[in-house]
């Protein structure tokens, strides 16, 4: 253990392996978001632009698998919600609980399941998988943690998992 970084708090240890922040998409999956995303990166794949092609190839219009996290990004403001709304809330919890003022996403891996179709309603939850011993990198001293974000459609089918490796740290001068 580093002199500057305390042991992993029991509060964090108690969270490992437990589903956190279960939520459902605020709207049905729809093509407007898909068209905007594809236009932004100039992806002309007819699978996403041509309904007939999508029907022929996969039986329905679908969203690109890489858009999975888009469906759970909260709007900054929405009626009925109070306080700050952030995606990947468990990441911010780790920073706060472990008193690590800085943090980065140092790695991201995606596992894709069944395609996300137009009209789907998705559910998700976050799971803290692990927290490392104290590490020192070029940016500072802190800990790595891994968070899985698992997502399912309204039929309970797995549509994907995003695995985030995060590094929370203190800069050398902090």
Where are these regions (language model features)?
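HotDog/MaoC-like acyl-thioester-processing domains
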Residues: 1-22, 105-174
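Hot-dog-fold acyl-thioester-processing enzymes
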Residues: 2-107, 173-174
């Amino acid at each position: 253990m580093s002199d500057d970084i305390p042991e992993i708090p029991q509060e964090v240890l108690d969270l490992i392996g437990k589903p956190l922040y279960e939520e459902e998409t605020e709207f049905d999956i729809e093509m407007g978001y898909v068209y905007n995303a594809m236009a932004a990166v100039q992806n002309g794949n007819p699978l996403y632009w041509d309904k007939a092609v999508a029907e022929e190839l996969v039986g329905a219009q679908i969203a690109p698998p890489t858009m999975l996290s888009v469906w759970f990004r909260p709007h900054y403001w929405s009626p009925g919600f109070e306080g700050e709304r952030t995606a990947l809330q468990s990441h911010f919890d780790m920073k706060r609980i472990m008193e690590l003022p800085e943090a980065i996403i140092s790695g991201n891996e995606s596992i894709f399941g069944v395609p996300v179709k137009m009209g789907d309603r998705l559910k998700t939850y976050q799971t803290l998988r692990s927290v490392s011993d104290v590490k020192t990198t070029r940016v500072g001293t802190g800990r790595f943690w891994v968070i899985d974000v698992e997502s399912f459609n309204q039929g309970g089918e797995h549509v994907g998992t995003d695995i985030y490796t995060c590094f929370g740290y203190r800069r050398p001068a902090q």
